[in-house]
Swiss-Prot record:
Protein name listed in UniProt: FHF complex subunit HOOK-interacting protein 1B
Phosphoserine modifications at: 467, 524, 537, 543, 547, 679, 716
GO CC terms: FHF complex
Gene name of the encoded protein: Fhip1b
Alphabetically ordered keywords of this record: Phosphoprotein, Protein transport, Transport
Lineage, highest ranks first: Eukaryota, Metazoa, Chordata, Craniata, Vertebrata
Disulfide partners: none
Compositionally biased residues, Low complexity: 496-510, 541-552
């Protein structure tokens, strides 16, 4: 797994990358080592006189002494930063550094200056000056100063002094973080130096000290540049701790780093907006352009990404402790109650936040703890997952956000998610008749399922144009001539249609184009075309043997997730266009999965289910009948359908022209999520600034909230004959216009969804890993590397 960009962007901050005081800025005295040494000794002699003066603090000239020492120290450290090793001894210290080490210059000056802290006047100002001088020396030195004990001791004394109660100021905090950041960069270049900064316990039984680390922790959740520098420096130390058991144990056992990170996430989450200002009807998730301008959310995301990076590079002890603290200190006490707020707006916000968090983190250990929280944690006797599943059937906005969350969960390709949502209900095979259990592994090699899905396209949505010439590859047979394209096999079996195994069906060439390509290609040709006459709709209602009032037993139910998806799918005519895009995309995502149980449940049109269990084919047949009934009740349905197609095509072309940058930047590695072309629904659900010409084209056709724009009851100038609405109040007219608009868009989306299911069923026939002989043992690799969710 590639390292995150936290480490790479620190390269420009290592010593030597600053613009040096080059020859053009260098005075002649700096170019002469002997002269530099003479000047250096002269400054030191002036300082020594002041240091050795008795009672200087009480003298009237005490302030003058402080100023003189400060000025002389600045000159000496400037010369020391320019010092180089002599050519005869390139590995040894330079002449100025050798003299400073011999005289213990840094510690003596610092000790004298720290004595003035007792008086309490100007302490923060002096401390900021000291930090700035040492930062300049460390960052601009041309020699490895930290290899020498006297230099490290002086730095540790200064860092220890920074822990004393001193009035804080922005300059003091900035100087401290900048010095610590430079020290961490130097230590990262020479990891062996890290343990020199780990001080032994001051007394028996006490914990050791790593001031380089402990002084950075209070700044980890600061906003702005200061917090970013602190997190960058801490991340360097985390990476070093992976190779140092001593430092790793110190961070895990003797520091408050992990509790601070977890409790900081909780505090930052409490400051997030409880209500999200929705930018448009198609909004369903938080993208970077949505949250980057919200300071509270941007700060939280920065801290969450930092936690993800720490778990990625830190010592295993630190990783485990941080994951546990995030689960027990943030997810359970904070996210759990937030997801169960009574206000719908708060539920929408918390669900959108959770989806954003899952989409942003990439480290498997952190993803595992989020999934463990969702799948196993119970809030008021119900798991978080059950609560989220139930919300799919709620109002439009909460439904869209919930569907977006489950789309992200399925994109993780985690077997535990699929098991909890679907497979644990399908594994007993109680949803199928006993005689059908051996057929679960069957693969549709002859395109019968694809033909069945295409036969469900409503007659009112078909373009009755002459059939194109029949290509040679259209007939799929194992031998012998193919049948006439207009012939269809009789449907056998009430409730669960089947096709004679000897039949040969005319189907397109197997392919898996994106939803956008399918939609644009079919609509540009004038609608969906069938290779033969439209087949008669098979009987797709429930089996006559099932009583109307009988509820399916728990053993027969396909699970609450599939039940709520099917219920929402059956009400496609009442859903908004954006809900239908998310809904059909989620069902198609499930259908793409190669697991035989799931594939047979969704795509095997010959499977005979229990009388009380609805199949996807039955649900789609119900939607087809509703669309045809609606089309028969609207005299101008063809004109409305044409307008809706034009709008969706224009919107699709608009978002496709904007390119993939309109969507969120993927953070997950290729091993977890495979890249693919965006679907039509994804493109239409994006928020992006549009080119002027395309924006104007879409605005002409865009449906309004009042039903205008497509001739769906609004009477816009460019619309066709308006729909005759019932007389009554404005709310009734708007409600009827919305109903008509949703139904017309459903009539556009539904055929494309059927074509996609047909393409997916064909793709399974040529890509399924279960095409081996039934006598052979099938070995399927695990879906993901998350491992078990149980702790």
């Amino acid at each position: 797994m590639e390292k995150m960009n936290w480490l790479s962007r620190l390269a420009s901050r290592v010593p030597g990358h600053r613009v040096p005081q080059g020859a053009s800025l260098q005075t002649p005295v700096m170019a002469d080592p002997e002269t530099c040494l003479m000047v250096f000794k002269n400054h030191w002699s002036q300082v020594v006189r002041i240091l050795e003066r008795q009672g200087s603090r009480a003298a009237a000239g005490g302030a003058d002494d402080l100023s003189a020492v400060r000025n002389h120290t600045y000159q000496m450290l400037t010369l020391l930063a320019e010092d180089r090793a002599v050519p005869s001894a390139p590995s040894g210290p330079g002449p100025l550094l050798e003299f400073a080490l011999r005289e213990d210059l840094l510690s003596r000056v610092l000790t004298w200056q720290l004595q003035w802290d007792e008086f309490g006047d100007g302490v923060e100002e002096r401390r900021a000056e000291q930090l700035k001088l040492f930062e300049m020396l460390v960052s601009e030195a041309r020699q490895p100063l930290l290899r020498h004990g006297p230099v490290r001791e002086a730095l540790l004394a200064l860092l220890d002094a920074c822990g004393r109660p001193v009035p804080s100021s922005p300059a003091l905090d900035e100087g401290l973080v900048l010095l610590l950041s430079q020290l961490c960069v130097c230590v990262a270049r020479e990891p062996s130096l890290l343990e020199f900064f780990l001080q032994p316990p001051p007394e028996p039984g006490a914990a050791p000290r790593l001031l380089l680390f402990s002084r950075l922790v209070p700044f980890v959740h600061r906003e702005g540049t200061l917090g970013q520098q602190a997190r960058d420096a801490l991340l360097l130390l985390m990476a070093l701790s992976d190779g140092s058991p001593t430092v790793g144990r110190y961070i895990a056992d003797h520091s408050y780093f992990c509790p601070v990170l977890a409790t900081g996430l909780s505090a930052l989450y409490s400051s997030l907006p409880r209500k999200i200002e929705v930018p448009g009807d198609d909004w369903h998730c938080l993208r970077r352009e949505d949250w980057i301008g919200v300071p509270a959310l941007a700060l939280f995301m920065s801290s969450l990404e930092f936690c993800n990076a720490v778990i990625q590079v830190a010592h295993p002890l630190v990783q485990k402790q941080l994951v546990d603290y995030i689960h027990n200190g943030f997810l359970v006490p904070v996210m759990g109650p937030a997801l169960h707020k009574t206000s719908v707006e708060e539920m929408i916000a918390s669900t959108a936040y959770l989806e954003l968090f899952l989409r942003s983190i990439s480290e498997p250990a952190l993803l595992r703890t989020f999934l463990r929280f969702l799948l196993l944690h119970r809030h008021d006797t119900h798991t978080i997952l059950d609560t989220l599943v139930a919300r799919i059937g709620s109002n439009s906005r909460l439904c869209m956000v919930s569907l977006s969350l489950f789309r992200t969960l399925l994109n993780l390709s985690c077997e535990d998610v699929l098991l909890q949502l679907v497979l644990r209900y399908l594994v007993p095979c109680n949803h199928v008749m006993l005689s059908q259990k051996p057929a679960v592994r069957d693969v549709d090699l002859y395109g019968r399922a694809a033909d069945k899905f295409l036969s469900l396209i409503p007659r009112c949505c078909r373009h009755h144009a002459p059939s194109p010439p029949r290509p040679e590859h259209a007939s799929w047979a194992r031998g012998g001539p193919s049948r006439e394209p207009g012939r269809r096999e009789d449907i056998t079996g009430p409730g669960s249609p089947s096709v004679d195994s000897s039949s040969v069906v005319t189907v397109p060439r197997p392919s898996t184009p994106s939803r956008l390509a399918l939609f644009l290609r079919q609509q540009s040709l004038g609608g969906s075309e069938s290779p033969g006459p439209a087949p008669r709709s098979p009987g797709l209602t429930a089996s006559p043997t099932s009583s109307p009032g009988r509820r399916p037993s728990p053993a027969e139910e396909p699970g609450p997730f599939m039940a709520v998806l099917f219920a929402k799918l059956e009400n496609m005519l009442q859903n908004s266009v954006y809900v239908n895009f998310l809904l059909t995309g989620l069902v198609a995502q499930l259908a793409c999965h190669p697991q035989p149980l799931l594939r047979s449940f969704l795509l095997n049109t010959n499977m005979v289910f229990q009388p009380s269990v609805k199949s996807l084919l039955q649900v789609l047949g119900s939607v087809k009948n509703k669309i045809e009934s609606f089309a028969a009740s609207q005299e101008d349905f063809p004109a409305l359908l044409s307008k809706a197609k034009k709008y969706l095509i224009a919107r699709g072309k608009l978002d496709w022209a904007e390119g993939p940058t309109a969507g969120p930047t993927p953070r997950r590695s290729d091993s977890l999520v495979r890249s693919r072309r965006p679907s039509l629904g994804e493109l239409l659900l994006r928020h992006a600034h549009s080119p002027t010409r395309a924006r104007q084209a879409v605005q002409v056709l865009q449906p309004g909230r009042d039903g205008t724009g497509l001739g769906l009851g609004g009477g816009s100038p460019g619309a066709s004959t308006p729909v005759l609405l019932p007389r009554g109040g404005a709310s009734e007219r708007q409600g009827e216009a919305l109903r008509v608009k949703n139904a017309v868009y459903c009539a556009v989306i539904f055929p494309e969804f059927l074509k996609e299911l047909a393409a997916i069923s064909q793709a399974h026939a040529v890509t399924s890993p279960f095409l081996l002989d039934t006598s052979e043992e099938v070995s399927v690799p695990p879906i993901s590397g998350f491992g078990p969710l149980n702790p």
